[in-house]
Amino acid sequence: MILLDGKSLAEKIKNQIKQEIDQLTQKGYRQPVLSVILVGENPASQIYVNKKIKDCASVGIKSKPFFLPENITQTELLELIGDLNGDEEVDGILVQLPLPSHINTLEIIEAINPYKDVDGFHPINVGKLATGRNDAILPCTPYGIMKLLHEYNIDHFGKDVVVVGASNIVGKPMSLLFLKDEKSTVTICHKNTKDLKSHTLKADILVVAVGKPKLITEDMVKEGAVVIDVGINRVDGKIVGDVDFENVKKKAYAITPVPGGVGPMTVAMLLYNTLEIYKRKLIEI
């Protein structure tokens, strides 16, 4: 069984990013700049944002955080995004999700300049991904998963891929990446899928992203499958995934741990996207 170590690969990617930024700044170019917007005081979101700010600093990306009150209006938030869209010194914009219930999340995402959309959530970037365009900014978690598979020489050509979870953040874009260039046969499962086990047992590559601890058990995975666990759940004070890791690993060819698998890759690809957006602007100068 191969343990897909996202933590070590993420460090490798971050080191490469740091080296590239160091080379650019030594030539007189400014640092890349990422604006991070957090609305409210959700403890988990605060942890994620602070981690992103810390990781930005570690590679030489300048972060420009905005910590906004829970009761900010839709109009006020849109005005801030408009200002950041027009700021030539800002390369990337990230709005930490989830947003408070009174904020229209889709409208906020659509307000971000698609060329500054480091999360890859804007409909233009999603459309580019869906149509196979190579200039799409890719969502960080699915992109990180593809990088992880590539690092371990796991090819998905001709494979049966099953994605459990149909969110806009992971499930849907993940499916589109596997479909790109007609490489894989992809099945998406969701809350209305009948007999989930019958689908997961067919998977050469199984990606699970639903937020239900140990949803996927050993009897739901075929021998020799590659299992990617995106879930992050807190159970009895411990972080666990959506897969029953200890039992499923007995059957898997390769599997991601939780923590230390997909999570670090998501942050690494956020930094990667920020650098790529910055470099695109340099080419235009």
Curated annotation (Swiss-Prot):
Keyword Lipid biosynthesis carried by entry: no
Protein origin, superkingdom: Bacteria
GO biological process: L-histidine biosynthetic process; methionine biosynthetic process; purine nucleotide biosynthetic process; tetrahydrofolate interconversion
Enzyme Commission number, as recorded: 1.5.1.5, 3.5.4.9
Any one GO molecular function term: methylenetetrahydrofolate dehydrogenase (NADP+) activity
PROSITE patterns linked: THF_DHG_CYH_1, THF_DHG_CYH_2
Coiled coil segments of this chain: none
Keyword line: Amino-acid biosynthesis, Histidine biosynthesis, Hydrolase, Methionine biosynthesis, Multifunctional enzyme, NADP, One-carbon metabolism, Oxidoreductase, Purine biosynthesis
Residues annotated as binding NADP(+): G165, A166, S167, I232
Family under the similarity heading: Belongs to the tetrahydrofolate dehydrogenase/cyclohydrolase family.
Cited function: Catalyzes the oxidation of 5,10-methylenetetrahydrofolate to 5,10-methenyltetrahydrofolate and then the hydrolysis of 5,10-methenyltetrahydrofolate to 10-formyltetrahydrofolate.
Record note on quaternary structure: Homodimer.
Protein name stated in the entry: Bifunctional protein FolD
Species per Swiss-Prot/TrEMBL record: Sulfurihydrogenibium sp. (strain YO3AOP1)
